């Protein structure tokens, strides 16, 4: 393996002399040169890493675990040819025994989000929603949001992070606003990245730890102020969410396919409706609420 992929290894000076060590990597790409791979097939290593998590839990409220799925036994064996026992169920249980409210968030891909949720993670990256919003079509977004709430409520929703380009550089301003409403009015953890609310354009490497001065996009800043105010409403914080079906406004009008609609419903009857035309064209639709709450009453819609 060393002769075939020398870029995945490095020689390091240690107290035990010069050692040839493998860089951490996933099965599909070269190793990360700023990392060293640990052998999770070694039970003593797993116990040592649980000890590290316990130490961290005594100092903060939670951790984001980078590429957390690489530790899963089936992924680890596919990458390194080494069998291992499950690590995350033991690790999350050990930490919660001491710090019950400690939060685990996983960076995870390859449709393994549910697997890690079942192994103790409170939240998992929702890269699937992000990718579908970038593609710019409403139907795949709706399909993704049809998943069960036991799964969706444990997803971390985002429009940018340190691995992705800036949202303001990725989307037009109109699409940015629409994607933000879809993302952050969905259930789950709402993840905002430093500089996102100000419309920063330049992606910054976390290794650089500094950034150029950029002007604030006042229009986006005001938009996010309004969005954050909406997210503070009790109906969003403690209510129940559901996706709503959109149907044609009249026969032959296919523009209903471009809409994404949902609502939050509170315990006192309050309702917050979200309806987004996720396209560049004018469209029309009817929304099915699936109950009789609107019949024989007058309602005033407030934007």
Predicted regions and their residues:
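Active-site and adjacent substrate-binding regions of carbohydrate-active enzymes
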Residues: 1-303
């Amino acid at each position: 393996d060393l002769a075939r992929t020398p870029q995945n290894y490095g020689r390091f000076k240690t107290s035990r002399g010069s050692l040839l060590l493998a860089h951490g990597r996933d099965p599909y790409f070269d190793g990360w040169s700023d990392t060293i791979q640990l052998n999770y097939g070694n039970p003593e290593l797993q116990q040592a890493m649980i000890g590290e998590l316990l130490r961290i839990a005594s100092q903060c409220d939670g951790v984001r675990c980078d590429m957390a799925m690489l530790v899963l036994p089936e992924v680890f064996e596919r990458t390194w040819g080494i069998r291992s026992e499950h690590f995350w169920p033991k690790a999350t249980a050990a930490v919660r025994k001491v710090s019950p409210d400690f939060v685990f968030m996983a960076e995870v891909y390859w449709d393994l989000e549910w697997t890690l949720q079942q192994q103790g993670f409170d939240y998992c990256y929702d890269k699937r929603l992000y990718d579908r919003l970038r593609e710019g079509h409403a139907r795949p977004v709706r399909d993704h949001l049809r998943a069960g709430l036991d799964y969706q409520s444990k997803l971390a929703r985002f429009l940018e992070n340190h691995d992705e380009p800036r949202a303001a550089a990725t989307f037009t301003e109109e699409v940015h606003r629409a994607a933000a409403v879809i993302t952050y009015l969905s259930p789950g953890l709402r993840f905002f990245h430093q500089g996102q609310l100000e419309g920063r354009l330049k992606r910054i490497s976390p290794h650089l730890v500094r950034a150029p001065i950029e002007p604030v996009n006042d229009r986006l800043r005001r938009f996010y102020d309004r969005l954050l105010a909406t997210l503070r409403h009790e109906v969003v914080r403690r209510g129940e969410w559901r996706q709503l079906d959109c149907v044609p406004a009249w026969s032959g009008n296919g523009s209903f396919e471009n809409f994404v609609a949902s609502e939050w419903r509170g315990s006192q009857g309050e309702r917050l409706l979200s309806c987004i035309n996720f396209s560049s064209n004018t469209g029309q639709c009817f929304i099915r609420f699936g109950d009789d709450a609107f019949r024989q009453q007058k309602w005033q819609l407030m934007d």
